[in-house]
Amino acid sequence: MTLQPAILSEPDTPAPAEALTRVSPMMEQYHEIKAANPGLLLFYRMGDFYELFFEDAEIAARALGITLTKRGKHKGQDIPMCGVPVERSDDYLHRLIALGHRVAVCEQTEDPAAARARKSVVRRDVVRLITPGTLTEDTLLDARTNNYLLAIARVRGSTGGDRLGLAWIDISTAEFIVTECALGELAATLARINPNEAIVTDALYSDPELGPLLRELAAVTPLTRDVFDSATAERRLCDYFAVATMDGLAAMSRLEATAAAACITYVERTQLGQKPPLSPPSREIAGATMAIDPATRANLELTRTLAGERRGSLLDAIDCTVTAAGSRLLAQRLAAPLTDAGAIAHRLDAVEAFVADPILRDGLRATLRAAPDLARALARLSVGRGGPRDLAALRDGLLAADAALAQLAAATSLPQEILAAMAALRRPSRQLADEFSRALADELPLQKRDGGFVRANYQAALDETRALRDASRQVVAAMQARYADAAGVKGLKIRHNNVLGYFVEVTAQHGERLMAAPMNATFIHRQTLAGQVRFTTAELGEIEAKIANAGERALGLELEIFEKLTAMVIAATDDLRAAAQAFATLDVTLALAKLAIDDNYVRPEVDGSLSFAIEGGRHPVVEQALKRDGQPFIANACDLSPGPAQSSGQIWLITGPNMAGKSTFLRQNALIALLAQIGAFVPAARARIGIVDRLFSRVGAADDLARGRSTFMVEMVETAVILNQASERALVILDEIGRGTATFDGLSIAWAAIEHLHESNRCRALFATHYHELTALSGKLPRVFNATVRVKEWHGEVVFLHEVMPGSADRSYGIQVAKLAGLPPSVIARAKTVLAKLEANDRGQSARALADDLPLFALTARAPAEALPPTEAEQLIAALQALHPDELTPREALDALYALKAKLPK
């Protein structure tokens, strides 16, 4: 969703005077804090609840489905209010952030008792600004997905060619990337990055061309122009990364620097002045990754299905990773396949090494399975939101690094990518792991404020303080026995309440003894009740103070230790970050090796040619689904390589019936190319693929009512993108172009599109169609090759063989598919009659003449069986269904078998 334009103002912004008149002190404070944080939902701490007021309450109540009530009045009007319990606030925050809202968390910063003593409202301050793109908490993040904040800056071209600078950050993993693109490339780039929040200028947000595209993102935050000030961008970047000049950072354009500076400015504001330690910006080189437009990503279901689910996507099918960081890296690679054959070969070498060594592969996967998410633990500690378990995660990660290095050291001839990962794993000092092992207890609380996370015997002062805290009962019990003996009062008790603290209590008859000399020198009278008299002593007061402070002092000492350990972590940030990346790289490589072994994938040959030769290709997702059902996948070859037209062609024109597997064949070849270029083995018997620089898919379509576009219009827009942008190195798959309009219109469009692909784009393409007339183009265009999907007719039934072979189909078998779908028999019978008449007249008869010639279609009272007699196959199936094998004698079974054989056609 899109949020209101907002500036994350500094906390000293004054509130409007009119908002502060005639309100209670609490509401006055609320208005001041709210005015300093416009555009954010204010979670205002009130005891054990966070409360929201006015419009914030109405928004939150709708979004969370909680009760909207009221609290007092403001200017004579009821104040809308809703609230959520503090202890469950993370759940509510997660839901609000997922909907694109931003939240300011306002906490009580003093004890209410201190406020009462001052006769004033409790002091409160905003301690966190939570936005969709600046999350670090595990409870708010998806462990397997990056959480990107994206900044977009624009410069107007003198001839109308606008350029855009993009910078995106994941502060939960410290990634920071910049690039520059043309306006026409923005949609594909946004689809690849998939940001959780985008920041832009007010002007860009309101731009008639860019605005609609931006508003399709999950959350957009318009900011004032000063955040995107190019004149101060380099200084802001240098200040953030503590370098004297931009020479200390990666080379980047002024436009990229502007976007990068906007990112870090927004991060600093949302983190209330803290500077999360980010990796220096890395510059993404234009053309280094395969360009994939949004429609193609959606159609191929790379990371999400068309229904928005991860399950059933390509990512779900190939994700064998055992760590969250590995899963994130695999998704990144799938979103941005490489176009450098050398870099792809390095990745494939690493996968092949693990394919060839099952013992090393399985052992390393077991080691990585125990490795925590180092990157996100490091990020939380860096911004002050970490806990003891994050320190333990780093300890366990370093121990896992040692184990992994020991396993890898036993291997020989490791490829470059694995050697680089080993070097990164060696970087962190092992003193960190040793220190954390000595310092951290076995059982750790979630929050550092809970205490109890430092191991006994780590610090003497802490042990002494804990002993006093934990031994308080024994100390008081010993004092009680000593006082009872000294006073000669066996019933003397030491008790405690919140008013008097610790006190000595005796019955009324013994009270006079303690108030008389010499006992009154020790026991000081405090209170007389009906049946008891209460006293205190100087010693008891001292012990009470020690006991009361012991818990606080113990926690304070633990927090000091926590800060010391955290400082050690921050000092080693770069080394720990490198180790975290190495874990992710190893995990992805191992996962792809396991996938190759489990599903019989092969190493593709990827080079700089224009080849595309697949033998025994399979669809990775469909194959897995069929395997679960115990069914085989029919493999098919595809050769789009340049060569003689009679053997193949760079444009395959595929005809065949519905349900035969044309769309699956199209998609599987696109996915094989994509898998090859992320450095994965592929589902085929053999594959040689020349680098694909752009991947286009126009498969299936739905209307876009929000933009006022029909299904056919969506289809034409997607086709236009392909015809205008596909290069010689592109791979294009097109399914049934022109089907959404009149037959001859659609045929004409499809015909012209094929000619354009052949003559102008000159790319590799798969074109599936039901316009059989198009097959004539293979005789006219030398690089067009006809292919068809085999079917077999058997006694009036159609059997889909799912085999792609040279040739063309003369029928689409639509009526047979309609019958399989369950259309009423009377409709099927009527359709056959109409089809026969159409075919007899070769479609040359006018619609009016055809309607006059055919008898009127009318439903009768005839039974469906009379309308369409069962086929021989249906009769055989019915006979088999009527048999009950467990109830037949051997003789009856034999007779039944002969009877069935007799029903078979001669």
Curated annotation (Swiss-Prot):
Q: Where is the signal peptide?
A: none
Has UniProt tagged this entry with the keyword Ribosomal protein?
no
> What's in the keyword line of the UniProt record?
ATP-binding, DNA damage, DNA repair, DNA-binding, Nucleotide-binding
Source domain of life: Bacteria
Q: Which Gene3D superfamilies match?
A: 1.10.1420.10, 6.10.140.430, DNA repair protein MutS, domain I, MutS, connector domain, P-loop containing nucleotide triphosphate hydrolases
The UniProt entry's sequence similarity note says: Belongs to the DNA mismatch repair MutS family.
Query: PANTHER family per the record?
Result: DNA MISMATCH REPAIR PROTEIN MSH1, MITOCHONDRIAL (PTHR11361:SF34), DNA MISMATCH REPAIR PROTEIN MUTS FAMILY MEMBER (PTHR11361)
- Name listed for the protein in its UniProt record: DNA mismatch repair protein MutS
